Amino acid sequence: MDVAAYMTELGQQARAASREVARSSTAVRNQALLATAAALDAARSELATANSKDLERGRENGLDSAMLDRLELTSQRIDAMIEGLRQVAALPDPVGVITDMTYRPSGIQVGKMRVPLGVIGIIYESRPNVTVEAASLCLKSGNATILRGGSEAIHSNQAIARCLKQGLSEAGLPETAVQVVSTTDRAAVGELITMPQFVDVIVPRGGKGLIERISRDARVPVIKHLDGVCHVYIDSHADPEKALKVAVNAKTQRYGTCNTMETLLVDDEVAEDLLPLLAEQFRSKTVELRGCRRTCAILGDIVEATEEDWHAEYLAPILAVKVVDGLDGAIEHINRYSSQHTDSIITENYTRARRFLTEVDSSSVMVNASTRFADGFEYGLGAEIGISTDKIHARGPVGLEGLTSQKYVVFGDGHIRT
């Protein structure tokens, strides 16, 4: 069977399964999640064997140490997958919830009901634990899913897929409710993103090149973010202690995440006092600073930033630093260079904080908090399938509710329109 025919078959099966999953009860979907957790626990040896094949092939193909680390399924990571399934099972189910019910002057009642999206396509790279994370969230929210992982994790993903199928079967749900693409042919991605008759939304998780390609070529709506160029702005009304603490955490708590600060903006009124203190903290953590001319004049021995630095998502111990002309300058810089992911202001002035919240056009905007909090778990969503910087449908961390839509429901008692 060629790739196009294979993907069409997966799509047809997913569409049929999505109807059964959508009408299943919360208890049944939770049963499938818990049964999958048990299946993973029982299949540790099989998972380790499959993963070792991927790791061996990865070394032969010259994968770097960071990629191999993301690929590895350690015992602790299997534990985390199992615990993640149990946590998702414990989350409130958004499906079927009716909100905003009101009486209209005509006497009818109008409200909104949460419903599944249908079939969700997930395209991701490297990390096999994403297979479980994504499948569990899609299933809990009443959706079927087709998962296309990276070719480097094919054996691990197929071993996980067998556990998912076992969990679905034990709960009485169709095994085709979660399907992991078994071919490594890259044409499968092209087919998956151009099947609107079978797939309702695509969620890509990977590098910028992958997401740009999917955004350009997809004929299906895409939930995505391209970059995490996040800013912290230290206002002239900032508490210096808070400013130091938040800025250092936003950059150094983890370097390789999309919610890590990549550019630090400092108000010109406090730059002379705060920049040396900030530089000392960052240097102690071996962070390379790249500054504007005013920053270089204050600090002296740092690299001068170029235009590319203001656009950069380093994902590394490198930080761009700019002195700005007050709140106006900070907002102007952020709205020009930000990826609309997460930006934060450090200030004790409520009016200035409100203006920042209103005028900065990002999916998460913060006051006196580290950008590292931009995360579904930290927001109380329980878990997330990704972060969206788009403005239609979901925006920000996308949890269970973001994997549903709404339909209007109307109740009457023989009402007719006159």
Curated annotation (Swiss-Prot):
Q: Which Pfam families match?
A: Aldedh
Identify which top EC class this enzyme belongs to.
Answer: oxidoreductase
* Entries under Gene3D superfamilies matching the protein: Aldehyde Dehydrogenase, Chain A, domain 1, Aldehyde Dehydrogenase, Chain A, domain 2
Pathway named in the protein's UniProt entry: Amino-acid biosynthesis; L-proline biosynthesis; L-glutamate 5-semialdehyde from L-glutamate: step 2/2
Listed GO biological process terms: L-proline biosynthetic process
Its cellular-component GO annotations read: cytoplasm
> What protein does this entry describe?
Gamma-glutamyl phosphate reductase
Q: Which organism is it from?
A: Marinobacter nauticus (strain ATCC 700491 / DSM 11845 / VT8)
Name the gene for this chain.
proA
